């Protein structure tokens, strides 16, 4: 096995930078995500976590997509605003993750030497969906990441990726912080929207009152 410890350190540092910037809604986070995941494609393949390796190829593509969405994905090519999912969307997401986990977990268990195939599959498919949530600025992504990263800690520790396992402990803490930051931004966003509606309605009401005299 290649001595990838130093390379893992670089990937971890970039991953921390990604999350710190994402919390602040800074689109530079996607540059850090792209290069960090490029490194992890090789690392995970080397330790027989094939679903995780494939996941990071997907992450690289999503880094490009996420950057575009944060820059131009909103109305009139403006940046996206924070949103949240309704209960039905969460139920559909969970069912989709469960189905994909069962299918790919079985395929890996019967056809490859993959380690912990079902856990590997769960964290992979859950992360696939949650990354879309991040790219679309769905606030609930932070809660999903807490679950995914908690499960992934054991997966990486088992494969002796100790720095990455430690990174995920930090990720859980930062996910809580990220949720609080985005929730505050969402509240401010809603307050600004309500204020704008009131400003638009006030002149209409004033005109109607004047005409009735």
Model segments located where?
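Polytopic alpha-helical membrane-helix bundles and their juxtamembrane interface segments
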Residues: 1-25, 73-75, 84-213
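Early transmembrane hairpin module of multi-pass membrane proteins
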Residues: 13-18, 26, 30-66
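Short, flexible micro-motifs
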Residues: 51, 69, 163
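Membrane-water interface of transmembrane alpha-helices
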Residues: 58-75, 183
């Amino acid at each position: 096995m290649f001595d990838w410890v130093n390379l893992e350190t670089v990937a971890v540092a970039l991953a921390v930078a990604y999350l710190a910037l994402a919390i602040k809604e800074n689109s530079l986070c996607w540059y850090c995500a792209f290069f960090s995941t490029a490194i992890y494609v090789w690392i995970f393949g080397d330790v027989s976590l094939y679903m995780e390796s494939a996941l990071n190829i997907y992450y690289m593509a999503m880094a490009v997509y996420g950057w575009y969405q944060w820059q131009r994905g909103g109305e009139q090519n403006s940046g996206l605003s924070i949103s949240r999912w309704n209960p039905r969307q969460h139920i559909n997401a969970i069912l989709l993750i469960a189905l994909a986990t069962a299918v790919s977990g079985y395929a890996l268990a019967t056809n490859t030497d993959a380690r912990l195939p079902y856990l590997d599959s769960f964290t992979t498919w859950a992360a696939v969906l949650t990354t879309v949530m991040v790219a679309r600025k769905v606030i609930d992504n932070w809660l999903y990441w807490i679950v995914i990263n908690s499960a992934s800690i054991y997966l990486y520790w088992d494969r002796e990726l100790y720095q990455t396992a430690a990174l995920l402990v930090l990720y859980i803490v930062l996910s809580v912080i990220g949720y609080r930051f985005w929730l505050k931004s969402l509240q401010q966003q809603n307050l600004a929207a309500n204020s704008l509606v009131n400003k638009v309605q006030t002149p209409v009401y004033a005109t109607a009152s004047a005409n009735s005299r």
